[in-house]
Each structure stands twice: as structure tokens, then as C-alpha cells.
Amino acid sequence: MEKFVVNGGKPLFGEVNISGAKNAAVAIIPAVILCDEPCQIENIPNISDVTLISKILQQMGAKVKRINKSTLYIDPTHIQTSVAVTDYVRGMRASYYLLGALCGRFKKASVLFRLPFLVNILF
């Protein structure tokens, strides 16, 4: 493990903002599908995968709004479909996270997702 050793007579001080982790964000956002009321998720990085999964949810009927650069508001109450088959799904490897949430809400799911070896599977 790496570490920093600071030698000297001046103590360190200040603030550091830590951005949310990409892999955690794309796993947490689909879980909103299971909610029966709007959710606000904070510390979400402003990256393309978050934008893609937001667009997927919007196409499924959710209302998604970025409140500021690190906060996402999602209202999943209008999602009426267990199908997530769009060009956005094809462009994102982590779209398989939608499977569990859709199965949990609708007891079935159809998600076209891209595996690293470029095989599309429909569940």
C-alpha cells in the first residue's frame, strides 16, 4: 500500500472533495427501479455511463434530472415496462445491473446487453 509521509513543522489542513466511484454509481442507479417514490442520489460522478443509464431509465418512463454536478433526482413511479432494449443499453457494458432491479419489480426482465466479447443476450 502506498502512503505519503510529510516531514516538516507545518500541519496539513484544508478540504478535499472526493467524487463518487463510477462502478458504484452505475450499480446504485438501477436500484431506484425498485422504489415506489422519487429518490435523490448524491455524490454521483458526472460521467458518460451515468448519463447513459439515466437515458435508459428515461426511455423506460422514469423522470431523471441532474440537480447539480453530483446529485441525481430519479422518479421511477412511471416505469411500466420490464424491457430495456435501446441503443443506450447496447453502448454500456454495465447495463446488466438493470436485470436484477427489473426482475425484482416486475418478476421478469428483457435487457439486451453487450458482453466484452460482443455477444448480445436477451433474457
Roles of regions detected by a PLM:
Residues M1-F123:
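Structural preference for solvent-exposed beta-strand-turn elements
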